[in-house]
Amino acid sequence: MEVTVKTLDSQTRTFTVDAEITVKEFKTHISSDVGISPEKQRLIYQGRVLQEDKKLKEYNVDGKVIHLVERAPPQTQPSTGGPSTSSSTSPSSSNAANVPGAGAPERNGNSYVMVGTFNLPHVMSGLGEASRGPRVSTVSGNDGSTLDVHINLDQQLPVQSEPRVRLVLAQQILQDIQRILDRLEGQPVNEQTAEPMDTAVSEGEASSRETLPQTTQNTDGQSNTAPTSHPSPSEYVEVLQSLSRVEERLAPFMQRYREILSSATSDAYENQEEREQSQRIINLVGESLRLLGNALVAVSDLRCNLSSASPRHLHVVRPMSHYTGPMLLQQAAIPIQINVGTTVTMTGNGTHAGQMPSDGNAAHTPTNTSEPQRSNSDNQPPSSGERPASEIPPTSVPHPHPRVVRITHQTVEPVMMMHMNIQDSGPGGPTNIPPPTAGHGGSAHIHMPGLPPEFMQAISHQITQQAVAAASGQQIPGFQAPPRFVFTRPAAPSFPPQPGVATTPPGPGGATTAVPGATVGPAGNASLAQMISGLVGQLLMHPVIVAQGGSNTPSSTSTPTSTSSSSSSSSSTVTTSTTTTSSTSFPTVSSGPSPQPPPGTDQHLSQLLGSLLGTAGSGMSNFAMGSPSITVTVPGMPAFLQGVTDILQATQTVPVSTSPPQSASQAPPPSSPSPPPAHSSPPPAAAPESLPPEFFTSVVQGVLSSMLGSLSAADQSGTESIAAFIQRLSGSHNIFQPDAEGPGGFFGDLLTLICHNFSLVDMVMLLHGHSQPLQNLQPQLRSFFLQEYLHQADPTPNNIQMASRNLTNGLEEYIRESFASVTVRDDVDITRTNLEFLQDQFNRITTHILHCADSTFGQRLLEMCNQSLFEWLALNLYCLRGDQSALTSVINERIRRLSLDVSPVLVSWVTSVLSLRLQVLLGQMPVTEGEIQRHIRRVGDVPQAPEASSQDQPMETTPVDCQNGAASPVPATTVEEVLFLPPQSSVPTICTDSEHPTQEDTGSEQWAASVPPEWVPVIRQDMQNQRKMKQQPPLSDAYLSGMPAKRRKTMQGEGPHLSLSEAVSRAMKATGAKPESSTDCVRRELDNSEAQGRYREQLCQDIQNILQDNESYSAQRFPNTQRAFRGDP
């Protein structure tokens, strides 16, 4: 039999199989073609799921279409692993090569919303072989409040339980120590030149071994029966005995080690051989102590529960991931660990393969506070200027480390823990970066050359607010305190700084900042733009919650090292990767006096911060004179991109509000008389110190590329249009083609034009005050307004005014409907007020588009759109008695009406964002009531004569958009419907009200005389509602096959109803082609009876050819095709 399988991506595949084959065998047969394993396939035919044990012929699917969907992965259930804490619970894992999403507990009903995604293979693309074969496992807490998702990127290990891993790790470390002791006891002195390299290799081996427990713990649960995986206490005793023997062998060298260090301060070491021998003992004994400490840490968390039944085994009290450092993500090497209430936490370990980790942030070194304290108590601390990592030559490369990403879903009190470290690989950079520390209740600080330390905090705060708003579906009030941006200028010393100690008092959040070391100066524009792009893009991919308020930064040079902090004391299930969350304060270490950068670097930094801050003057002069920091306070605006706006605003002197992308060149939407805010007041010209626009463009493009990198596989250049981007993601090719189901009329065509010509980069630049995209779009806008707005008429003031009136009259019903549920001032006619206001604004904007041809086109158009927006908000706020909530509800209600087919979660997020933006926008309203009084229309005012004379004119008599208010086609009417109206003349003109033919001349609405007068408006309203109804999409094969035969007969058509003019019009819209003559001329030529007949003949001939070539076609089975396509209809 022949079976067609249709997948969710609308692809169909035809298979020829034996009729006796079972459903299970059929799944196996097609699995290689569809790319879905048999156990995950779900075959559906006529609404029923095909059972695997039945034969395919029982379902009568020969020649039919079967729908194939992928079965969701089963929910993983944790199994108990002994009387231990939640971290020792044995996880239940699911192996997958493509990193599928692991099962998660119930996400608090409707409070869950996804505001960002990331593609793991894309993020891990820079890790080479280490990113091959990822495995996913989950661990649930005892109370069900946490879910840890472990993504293991290392190879499968033979051991399966963490206690076993701890013992194996300790044994391997002891073997390393024994090899070092062998060298101490019998290694010739002449081989000491190779000791640093050997030490580095040994350290690399130990580091890879030490990270094995964290990797291995993720594989727990993959084997349900592994009694030997849990070690017995006797095995622990054997390891402890081995530790004792190693300590005994090390004891004499420890004695010599102490003697050398006690005299190291003053000894001259004139004998070179003696000095080299002492140095060798210091190096090897120090390495032995490090390994010995790691071994003690590995086994110190092992416990035995004596109250459990025998045979007893060991368990751990805290996982090894408690000690490991964060993982290095791509783009500027940003290690990031994030814990978000009701979202996700990411931690991990490892570095890039070719990167030399320093002693303070290497992933293999346990950085918990307990381990350094123990290490410092057992060893003599190094001198002030000594760097422990100096023993490792730059040419040594450590062994690859296992890469593990740990994602924790937290459903309790929100906690934020972030650790960032931009490692410097250039000359003069820090070679030893101390481990960051955490303060309880403080704010996160990120120190980067040329960037504000609270950059990510500001952005993440904004994103989190929107995530919470979307999750709750409610508005969120403004912040209690405005965020503070502290910009710290780093120095660029030409020699290593003299280390010193400086302590600063705790900041408002109760935390201070560790600022050790020194950094190089800022790089060029290209590298800095890439660094900013990576930073912002990585953050926007992972929503986070940060602490309220800010922290003080010391007046000293900064290093690419940040602190970790916690903003909640009630959530203790997750800890930072570097320190415990119980610490409350820590000292601030900064470099001593450092030289000022050269004038060129200082001037470049001044230009950079001038561009980022958008300020020039006294603030920048502080930087030029050497002042290390400046604090800028901005309003607390919880908006999605407010942090990006305040930092990356390149040409403005004050923070400017933004909104979700809506083109500033676009007039208010046709179906909404209350457009959402597109941009605030126009920005002034760029300051002289600002960087060129290309820098801003590269930053924006890099941010979007980083955010959408996993989705933009087809185009990484940032030039892909919005329409192409959405069409590629949705898999549909008619989203922005005005037809019966899409946006129609003038506004639909305008939206199509904008989406096909603007990229996401262009839209973000518009929202930030850059008018260059509008300037580039000038030819297309002018041509569009001439054809679609004026219909090839001359752009005279009278024609423009008539076109504006005809266009806005179609919005009357929408305006009346939108303001019906709110309280309006008693003496204000809000419908006429909005209509005439929109007419005036359209007149201004259209006149500018059609007549302005100089270089100020884009900037002036942006200013006019911004001014129109603010005036519209102020005008309606006055009409609604100053009630901001009423104005917000009008806008949100219109959005909901337009988004009936959109996900409610997304609609809730959009309305929440707009509500918050409106609160800020209305609070900064630059338009006064006196300025909008001229637009207000009172009840009882005599309307203008043209409007009065056009109220009763019928719709059917007006050519192409020359409609009036009551009988005009609604904005959902397609352009094709309008094109079939009878022509008035060969040359299109803008009709005036006096030129409308009377009702007696046309007889188009003779039905109005035969019905009671009170029914006329009801019938007209019903006619308009019917025009807005979407055409039913074509039914699927499965639906038609399961439909009763009688109903199927009643639905059979009588051949194609598509006329030639309709087909050509749709083809023009799909391809963007424009006629050389007017649209009316093309329509008249296509309506010719001879052309229609030829078109009908060609259409039937094409269908006949298709039927002849179709092997599945049978004239006996489909007899109606003869009558429909071969006979004379």
Swiss-Prot record:
Pfam families linked: BAG6, Bag6_BAGS, ubiquitin
Biased segments, Pro residues type: 667-686
InterPro entries: BAG6, Bag6_BAGS, Ubiquitin-like_dom, Ubiquitin-like_domsf
Record's keyword terms, sorted: Apoptosis, Chaperone, Chromatin regulator, Cytoplasm, Nucleus, Secreted, Transport
SMART domains on file: UBQ (SM00213)
GO cellular component annotations of the record: BAT3 complex; cytosol; extracellular region; nucleus
Principal location: cytoplasm
GO biological process: brain development; chromatin organization; endoplasmic reticulum stress-induced pre-emptive quality control; ERAD pathway; internal peptidyl-lysine acetylation; intrinsic apoptotic signaling pathway in response to DNA damage by p53 class mediator; intrinsic apoptotic signaling pathway in response to endoplasmic reticulum stress; kidney development
Subcellular location: Cytoplasm, Cytosol; Nucleus; Secreted, Extracellular exosome
Molecular function (Gene Ontology), one example: ribosome binding
Residue ranges with Polar residues bias: 209-232, 364-383, 947-956
Gene3D superfamilies assigned to the protein according to its UniProt record, in alphabetical order: Phosphatidylinositol 3-kinase Catalytic Subunit, Chain A, domain 1
Top-rank taxon: Eukaryota
Biased composition (Low complexity): 73-105, 553-593, 655-666
Region (Disordered): 69-108, 187-235, 347-402, 490-518, 550-606, 654-692, 942-967, 987-1009
Domain Ubiquitin-like as annotated: residue spans: 1-76
Function: ATP-independent molecular chaperone preventing the aggregation of misfolded and hydrophobic patches-containing proteins. Functions as part of a cytosolic protein quality control complex, the bag6/bat3 complex, which maintains these client proteins in a soluble state and participates in their proper delivery to the endoplasmic reticulum or alternatively can promote their sorting to the proteasome where they undergo degradation. The bag6/bat3 complex is involved in the post-translational delivery of tail-anchored/type II transmembrane proteins to the endoplasmic reticulum membrane.
Assembly and binders: Component of the bag6/bat3 complex.
Protein name: Large proline-rich protein bag6
Provenance organism: Xenopus tropicalis (Western clawed frog)
Lineage of source species: Eukaryota, Metazoa, Chordata, Craniata, Vertebrata
